[in-house]
Amino acid sequence: MFCIQCEQTIRTPAGNGCSYSQGMCGKLAETSDLQDLLIYILQGVSAYAVKAREFNIIDAEIDTFVPKAFFATLTNVNFDDARLIEYVEQANTYRTRLKDAYEAQCAANGVMVAEMSAPAQLVLATAKPELLAQAPLAAPNRGDVHEDILGLRLLCLYGLKGAAAYMEHARVLDQTDAEVAGSFHEIMAFLGEDSVDVDKLFATSMEIGQLNYKVMAMLDEGETNAFGHPEPTQVNTVAVKGKAILVSGHDMVDLELILKQTEGKGINVFTHGEMLPALAYPEFKKYPHLVGNYGSAWQNQQKEFANFPGAVVMTSNCIIDPNVGNYSDRIFTRSIVGWPGVTHLVGDDFTQVIEKALALDGFIYDEIPHLITIGFARNALMAAAPAVIENVKNGSIKHFFLVGGCDGDKADRSYFTDIATQAPDDSLILTLGCGKYKFNKLEFGDINGIPRLLDIGQCNDSYSAIQLAIALSEAFECEINELPLSLVLSWFEQKAIVVLLTLLSLGVKNIRTGPTPPAFLTENLLNILEEKFGLRNTTTVEADLNTILNVA
């Protein structure tokens, strides 16, 4: 086992990364090894997808499978070895299908078959012990390479993994694009070649950022086409009396299915974590039994799910061990999510969830409502832009902070609470991702009717923040980096990595990230990123605010 993809990975003077019998996330070594092997075979699938495209062979089924299966290896998604082996076997079938199609076209056209990469050629074993024996070939730190080369490879690998997750979220909303899929395959195939070309690897990281910008636009279009444009909305965040289902993750299509299937059954539905923004979409407001948001960010789920007196559905990341809170018999997984022994739902029938919710007590009384305001995504931000611009011009608004990203359980993440609460009263704070839970239930007031705290939405809704920044730069006839805008991003896993690459690829500079740098980035690479982009780690709130606000 070697895994270094998330913030909680082991860090020691001897080296970084989880490499023992179990990772810090709870992932067993065998599970980690199977994930590595899956990625390796997927790189082989992509290698043949690239070659097949030379003959205009585009297999839409494979184009959607590869990012979906890749998503299953993201932090806190799938811990189920049996399911991972199914993905490996399916990937191998698809690899053979593309190989046969490509070689047939070569023969028909009198073209030599190309020499393929190792992931394209590996003869896959058929049983778990033999698959695990092959896993070292696929380890992310395979080979004897300089640590900077390895760091760049992993930056690309984890960034592309984040993009794959967003591609799958978009696909669920019927948003696919053959050109985007082709670019994805090209990068995936390249990473399977184990390049040692520093310039090419760095350029690829920027290509991943550009690719993800397109994917986020697709996802934005898919969500707004399906559910309307989010609008400022007050949301209750405490218990409501009655039977209950909690929906976590990111998949709003699953949420809609659950709402439709629970109509008239006396069950209240709550969102959790990154599903909170769903409550701002007009299409969901027609369901009176969607009563609010329960709980906070992913790392608190073992306590929050244990206390929730109903059924829980995990539609995507993040899942952690449900046995700790003794609720494994009432949590259900969907799509790419998996945990051994937990019921996995295939298809669109949520009867098992409904029956479980009806059999449980539910909340026995209403709590006094506690309301927060959400829904400041792209359309709402654009509608507010004229008022924001006017308040900048008259001096009422002097600075913008984007404070968001992934949450986590490290104590020093209190930094993000503190920088939001200590930001000057003449500043606006935009937030997104589950990092918002560090402060989204606090009161920030307003500036001439404009709320100081603007909740943009899920982590992928950084697309909305980018659109606002572009609009402001056009209004003030300046570059984005000349705006009084500071980005302070909390990172935990691979979606945050690809959002960062997206921003860097768009030329956004002077971003602060924290609380700790990714363990796979060497000191040399961090220095290069700071020199090239002004990217730096957070320090103290006082020092960072002084620098941001140019206080001597």
UniProtKB/Swiss-Prot annotation:
The keyword Protease does not apply. InterPro entries: HCP/CODH (IPR004137), Hydroxylam_reduct (IPR010048), Prismane-like_a/b-sand (IPR016099), Prismane-like_sf (IPR011254), Prismane_a-bundle (IPR016100). It comes from the Bacteria. CDD domains: HCP. It is an enzyme of class 1 (oxidoreductase). It catalyses: A + NH4(+) + H2O = hydroxylamine + AH2 + H(+). Its EC number is 1.7.99.1. GO terms for cellular component: cytoplasm. Its cofactor is [2Fe-2S] cluster; hybrid [4Fe-2O-2S] cluster. Hybrid [4Fe-2O-2S] cluster binds at residues 250, 274, 318, 406, 434, 459, 493, 495. GO terms for biological process: response to hydrogen peroxide. Belongs to the HCP family. This is Hydroxylamine reductase. It comes from Shewanella woodyi (strain ATCC 51908 / MS32). The lineage of its organism: Bacteria, Pseudomonadati, Pseudomonadota, Gammaproteobacteria, Alteromonadales.
